[in-house]
Design a protein with these regions (language model features):
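Intrinsically disordered, low-complexity, charge-rich terminal extensions
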Residues: 1-169
């Protein structure tokens, strides 16, 4: 079953990430081998068709299993954008990722404590930069894991598992 062959890597990545986060949300590790969890949150956009026949379905819901979007995958639509939540230790990051150009949007970082009066005035800004770097590092490790799998002989089996997951109610 060539479910994903010939598709854009970004669409495959988001589909794989949704699958993995659904079946094993805590099975991710960063470059240092430290575990973190991933979940698809609140909103997924799937598209199918070409030109004038292009259809888009945007599924949103705070605690929704996003069944309609998964149904769209079963009908040949592809994940084009998703809201992703990553948690490592006490840090939680949330952002929207676009499949076509890997654009990040609506990034929510962990709260940063307001500096004391005698602290460095740039401390808060530097802390936010650091948190963005942590978030991007986690995302980079996810994509590296995906690419290792995608370029391996195990990818065919993974496609079968994803297909079964899509068809599951």
């Amino acid at each position: 079953d060539g479910l994903m062959l010939g598709n854009v890597l970004g669409e495959e990545f988001l589909t794989w990430l949704w699958f993995q986060s659904d079946v094993a949300p805590g099975a991710f590790v960063n470059k240092e081998g430290q575990p973190f969890s991933v979940s698809m949150e609140q909103r997924i956009v799937v598209q199918g068709g070409e030109g004038d026949t292009r259809e888009t379905a945007s599924v949103a819901g705070t605690l929704s299993p996003l069944t309609e979007a998964r149904f769209g995958l079963g009908k040949g639509k592809k994940v084009t954008r998703a809201t992703i939540r990553m948690e490592k230790d006490e840090l939680a990051f949330q952002f929207t990722l676009s499949a076509d150009d890997f654009t990040l949007g609506s990034m929510k970082l962990p709260k940063v404590e307001k500096p004391e009066e005698d602290d460095d005035p740039d401390a808060m800004l530097l802390e936010r930069f650091y948190l963005m770097e942590v978030c991007l590092g986690l995302l980079e490790s996810l994509y590296a894991s995906f690419l290792r799998l995608r370029l391996s002989a195990a990818w065919g089996e993974t496609v079968q598992e994803i297909t079964a997951w899509i068809r599951r109610e």
